């Protein structure tokens, strides 16, 4: 897992496969009011079901715990990742809806 600081407010964690392709990524954004917003999680289809998302999630969480211990963490997640968040102490605050036109 490689950590990349995009700018002063976005940090991305990238998993690189043995063949040097991007296997997955997660990131977070620093927001006003001491808020860390988790965003942009993705694991390449060829690398799913191998524990990569958990490794990325854990790397990001450890980084935030060490560097931003007094920040509130927010995240929007899908049904497929909700249990991972709950296992890590997150609570569902509200349901959101995806709409498009």
What are these regions (language model features)?
Residues 74-76, 91-101:
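Conserved catalytic-core motifs of GNAT/GCN5-like acyltransferases
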Residues 85-86, 90:
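Conserved active-site tyrosine of GNAT-family acetyltransferases
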């Amino acid at each position: 897992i490689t950590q990349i600081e995009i700018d002063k407010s976005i940090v991305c964690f990238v998993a690189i496969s043995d063949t040097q392709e991007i296997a997955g990524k997660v990131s977070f954004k620093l927001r006003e009011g001491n808020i860390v917003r988790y965003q942009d999680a993705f694991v390449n289809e060829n690398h799913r079901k191998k524990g990569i998302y958990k490794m990325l999630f854990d790397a990001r969480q450890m980084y935030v715990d060490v560097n931003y211990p007094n920040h509130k963490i927010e995240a929007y997640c899908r049904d497929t990742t909700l249990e991972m968040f709950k296992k890590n102490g997150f609570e569902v605050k509200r349901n959101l809806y995806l709409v498009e036109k």
